[in-house]
């Protein structure tokens, strides 16, 4: 029993690898994340687009409804998932980059809906993507770990 407990206690999660948003117009959403947020495309098909974020995370954009049934792939299956309504995603940015991001959003005619100064010293700005999802750009000082 002691060996089993040791194995269990050593099991650790490394990071959130993928975050998914569900969109009505896949091409429109992809253009937003490429043009406005400068994300690097990793993969695309008729169901989804995948983007690299910071070299270690992946943002997935699924065409709304297509993932609500089991996806059958050559290597196995992906169980159903979907989302509705305005969801939230936050991206980390450097302190010195906040003003540049605000200027970039203004250049793309994207309204900043909110700004927050956090007790730990971080700052966040909030805006919407074309599907109404709330996008946050946050500097360090938001959480104890970031």
Q: What is the role of each PLM region?
A:
Residues 17, 37-38, 47, 87, ...:
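Residue-level marker for the onset of beta-strands and adjacent loop->beta junctions
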């Amino acid at each position: 029993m002691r060996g089993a407990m040791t194995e269990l206690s050593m099991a650790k999660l490394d990071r959130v690898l993928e975050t998914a948003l569900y969109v009505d117009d896949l091409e429109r959403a992809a253009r937003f994340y490429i043009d406005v947020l400068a994300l690097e495309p990793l993969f695309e098909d008729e169901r989804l687009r995948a983007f690299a974020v910071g070299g270690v995370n992946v943002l997935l954009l699924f065409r709304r409804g297509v993932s609500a049934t089991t996806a059958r792939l050559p290597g196995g299956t992906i169980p159903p998932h979907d989302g509705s309504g305005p969801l939230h995603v936050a991206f980390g940015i450097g302190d010195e980059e906040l003003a540049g991001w605000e200027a970039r959003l203004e250049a793309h005619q994207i309204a900043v809906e909110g700004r927050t100064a956090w007790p730990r010293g971080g700052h966040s700005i909030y805006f919407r993507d074309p599907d109404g999802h709330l996008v946050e750009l946050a500097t360090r000082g938001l959480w104890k770990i970031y």
